[in-house]
Amino acid sequence: VHAGLGGRAEPCTASRYLCRQHPVEPKDERDLLLRLNIIARRIGRRALLVPLDDAGAVFAAEHSAALAKEFVLSPPTPWTPRSVADKSELHRRCRALGIPTAESHFPDIPEEADAVLGRLGFPCVAKWARPWLLPSGQRSTMLVTGRAQAHRLLAGTAGPAGPLILQRYIAPGAGDWFFHGYFDDGGRCLFGGAGRKHVSYPAHTGHTVAGEWVCNPELEAHAHAVAARLGIRGVVDMDFRRDGENGDYALLDCNPRLGAQFRLFSDRGGLDLARVVHLAASGRAVPEPRPAYGRTIVVEQQYLQSSLRSPDALAHVRRFRDAHEFAWYAPDDLAPFVALGRRAASKAIGRAVRSSSALAQRARAAKTSGGN
């Protein structure tokens, strides 16, 4: 396994399964193509290219002709990834194709935003259409609880990540759900599973930090139908929320790539989506899936942060203790988990030092002021 990553050392680079890390910090798309070709030559043979974020999936699909000379690619058509990764385009396609989704609006000016907020009420959801173009560290989705907050966000709607989308908030009482699957060239699902999101981070609008593989034939059939209407090929990660008002599974997000929690869906034979991608791309048969319903996954550090804010801490402890899969901890590959711990400790020490320094400065300032 080779990884093309940014300049900062990531905990995953410590993995015993990683052959080599290749720094990738391109100036533009042309530069990225050049760097990927250099990586291909270093590897020495055609390797399977597996994007792990929306930007990579869109780039790989739209430059498939150039990349296919050096890499083996999954089957997405060039237009599909952008049309589902772009949340504004996804919403328009859902409306046109009759796919249930949350009511969404695209205000341009504060007056339009106020009218939308009057219709949707509070809280509502604000999200950026093209989150892969956001500055590092900026949240792509958040709950809006007041007009002033919406107006501040609206100021950035003309930026590359825009437009800003204001969306009806569907309460999670009927369940937060997701579906991961792989669809072949003919649109047939070779492997897939429905997951229940038990804990998200940030709460209500964030990604899965505690999830479970569940038997939900209704959602699986719905996800297959959604994929067929959208023309999905290859791997996909879809987020749904069941609407308590009408019982629909509303599609909230569609990522044309491996989902971060794909290892949740490791079946009783050890088959997961990464292996399915490799088998399909190499022309080999994909075995019949053997679902492992009840299998759970936890993202350690963010789950613990969420647990500290929960009134039911004991239930969180039990879920953590009984998890089958973790984002970082693996008994056969401990180095990434250790590296993550070191990074967390370093950040904590840095915060403590800065806090102590700030307190000392305030104390000196108060002493000087008192002396005068």
Regions found by a protein language model. Give the residues of each.
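ATP-binding N-terminal substructure of ATP-dependent carboxylate-amine bond-forming enzymes
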Residues: 1-76, 111-114, 342-372
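Active-site nucleotide/adenylate-binding loops and adjacent lid/helix of ATP-dependent enzymes
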Residues: 81-165, 170, 185-188, 217, ...
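Phosphate-binding site of ATP-dependent enzymes
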Residues: 145-204, 214-226, 241-245, 249-250
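Flexible, glycine/charged-enriched surface loops at secondary-structure junctions
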Residues: 165, 233-237, 287-293
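Glycine-rich phosphate/pyrophosphate-binding beta-alpha loops
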Residues: 198-202, 206-210, 255-270
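Conserved metal-phosphate-binding beta-hairpin within the catalytic cores
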Residues: 228-263
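Peripheral (often C-terminal) accessory segments that flank ATP-dependent C-N-forming ligase machineries
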Residues: 276-372
